[in-house]
């Protein structure tokens, strides 16, 4: 990279920093951080643990953005100083180091830009992710377990905590359905990119003839909603069943009927939860999931009405095939919404989803 190219790159990044500063109200952010820290110093702060955690999460979100922006500014200034030194006197080692720093810096700016994109009302929330294999028995159920592992690996890489709210094992292998609660800042903002049907093409390990099979799993993603969301659920509209919780492999993991299946009769929505040993706690979690699904249904109906008014033929909800994972006759993962693809299918199955997620988020604001 010549000095002129380095200068051009730094001029581009300087403009991006200027744009970030223009879109971020840093003064208001400082004031809000101070207000939240004052709340945390209150002796009664932990009396309501749920409210306390909400304050902490909001504070952490602002601090992360504020500190990350200032770190970018400092790095920009440092690299501009290095460029001035190189203009005065050639230094191969310094130039090589600066080229390396610029590449890393561009990637960091890109990541920061993505975080700013996550500005929808519930992007910052935890995510509830459900996997539902399609028709095809063992083959599609095994594909479900492969996706389960993929999302667990991705969550680990992000530093997110994963709780398994419900697990229904497949008859021979894999899963019939799984519900995960993925906890972390912006978990829903990232994972909403995964909502839709995921298609697998491979030589089936369950087919003695070695034929190629196509399997489908539907992935549904919802934000975990706070209690202040007003959704009325009448007791007479509910059918509640209890049963023994089961783990992977189908074994009973509790001797009491602690697992809960809750059916909302008017909508037909069914939720299940078996993550807690207490039936009461499972009921509470199931009710939270039900309210989330009812809220999501309400929002999707509003979107559908708006789309009809605008004359848009937009499919809302799940049912659209969003991504293909091809193991045979070649290796490729392709997102059909953004056309982003990679041949490194194993890395994707090991949780390297960020490039797909980032491409989707950029496409929504592009």
Curated annotation (Swiss-Prot):
Peptide chain release factor 2 directs the termination of translation in response to the peptide chain termination codons UGA and UAA. Belongs to the prokaryotic/mitochondrial release factor family. SUPFAM superfamilies: Release factor (SSF75620). This is Peptide chain release factor 2. GO terms for cellular component: cytoplasm. HAMAP family: Rel_fac_2 (MF_00094). Methylated by PrmC. Methylation increases the termination efficiency of RF2. It is found in: Cytoplasm. Its main location: cytoplasm. The keyword Protein biosynthesis applies. One of its GO terms (biological process) is viral translational frameshifting. Keywords: Cytoplasm, Methylation, Protein biosynthesis. The gene for this protein contains a UGA in-frame termination codon after Leu-24; a naturally occurring frameshift enables complete translation of RF-2. This provides a mechanism for the protein to regulate its own production. GO terms for molecular function: translation release factor activity, codon specific. It comes from Listeria innocua serovar 6a (strain ATCC BAA-680 / CLIP 11262). The modification N5-methylglutamine is found at residue 251.
